Regions:
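Noncatalytic, solvent-exposed loop/strand surfaces
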Residues: 5-404
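Bacterial N-terminal signal peptides
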Residues: 1-3
Length: 404
């Protein structure tokens, strides 16, 4: 059982966390050293803060963006060769939209099938554009109503856009047609919906696809429970309990084991993805109930080990088959919301103070091999494509490349 296979070219970075949404890149030759004066191909000024991450489609780089003080929700397209802004499209949403100061609007990353781009603008709706910026369709998805805003990114499976809408009183998961935006299925999970004033319940988790035998399964980290459903119909396949009310990270896949990690000091679970129905008592491999940190960024699995940088800036390595924590280490004295990526034989992850930490995927000891400073706040996750790294900070979008 493995992550579902992508249909697009390996060099493109078509969604948050890369081709499979797992934080694993096949890129080689990416820079290992950079700063404001080294290996910067270009940088462009951004007129608004944001937590969403860039994606790369052929010669174009895309981000979602909300200009400071504006009602606009934007999808921006840049030329990857020099950072020229090619076009800006989106929507105007003049109603008040609740979010938190740490989570600016347009927090969801776009996704592409290589021909079209889909962006979720929260209460402003779900939009689809072609690569030239022509709008193909839009869907009114409802109003997001949660004190901390939204953050899950849409993903594409076959001809469907899959969206974890929420958190808040209107939460649901749905599939929409890539052709015209028509709703194919929608469902709400029992624990997913919070009351009007329930701050500490909800899922900001981006779903992940997993191949099981000859079929593929949609994995969803939801309050209290990890769910596996059919991406085509939304019907249950299996679930596993043991989580808490707040979920930020995406599920992680290690062979036939799926790991889901709650946020806000909540538990982590691992379940063997075999069978149907409630697998809590029969297939749950381990449960970490105590001593858990706040987790916002997702980890990455290399071999049998999971590596993650938690929000307080403490990295963990976990042996997935047993749940043993093989090491913990505070890194660079900075907190992080960014997700970790395995690329070119090592690990990379951003911190909020604008550094990117490089580590060896060493299961026996924390081994930092480099720290690169840009010195600007970031909560986004880098994109990797054709030897280049794209980093979105609160001030700029960067293209990082080895100098010739």
């Amino acid at each position: 059982m493995i992550p579902a296979s992508p249909d697009a070219a390996a060099d493109d970075w078509l969604q948050w966390r890369g081709p499979l949404g797992t934080g694993i890149s096949e890129e080689t030759g990416v820079p290992q050293k950079w700063s404001q004066t080294e290996n910067i191909r270009w940088k462009v000024k951004l007129d608004g803060e944001g937590n969403s991450s860039p994606i790369v489609v052929d010669s174009k780089v895309f981000i979602t963006h909300a200009p400071t003080g504006s009602a606009q929700r934007e999808l921006r397209c840049y030329d990857r060769s020099d950072g020229t802004l090619l076009w800006t499209k989106g929507a105007e949403y003049s109603e008040k939209e609740i979010t938190h100061q740490t989570n600016p609007l347009c927090a969801s990353s776009p996704v592409s099938d290589g021909e079209r781009i889909v962006a979720w603008f929260g209460s402003a709706g779900l939009y689809c554009f072609d690569l030239n910026g022509e709008q193909r369709w839009k869907v009114e998805t409802g109003k997001v109503d949660h004190i901390w805003g939204y953050g899950s990114s849409p993903i594409i499976y076959q001809n469907l856009v899959l969206l974890n809408f929420g958190p808040g009183v209107n939460s649901y998961v749905a599939a929409f047609s890539m052709k015209d935006g028509a709703e194919v299925w929608r469902r709400t999970f029992p624990e997913q919906v919070s009351s009007k004033h329930e701050e500490y319940r909800g899922s900001w988790s981006t779903p992940v696809m997993m191949r099981q035998g000859n079929s593929e399964t949609l994995l969803l980290s939801m309050p209290d429970r990890l769910w596996a459903v059919s991406p085509l119909t939304g019907e249950d396949r299996w679930s596993c309990g043991g989580l808490s009310k707040l979920l930020y990270t995406s599920p992680l896949i290690a062979g036939d084991v799926v790991v889901s990690m709650a946020g806000y000091n909540g538990p982590a679970i691992a379940v063997r993805a075999e069978g149907t129905g409630d697998l809590t008592d029969t297939k749950r491999v381990w449960l970490h109930e105590k001593g858990n940190p706040q987790r916002v960024g997702s980890g990455v699995v290399v071999g049998e080990h999971l590596y993650i940088l938690n929000e307080p800036g403490i990295a963990w390595c976990i042996h997935v088959p047993t749940g043993e924590i093989t090491w913990k280490e505070r890194l660079d004295g900075a907190s992080s919301w960014s997700s970790m990526t395995a690329v070119d034989g090592h690990l990379q992850v951003n911190t909020m103070k604008g550094s990117t930490i490089l580590l060896q995927a060493n299961p026996t000891a924390c081994q930092v091999i480099g720290i690169n400073e840009l010195g600007e706040m970031t909560r986004a996750t880098p994109a990797y494509s054709n030897g280049q790294i794209f980093i979105r900070t609160y001030q700029h979008l960067y293209c990082i490349e080895e100098s010739q």
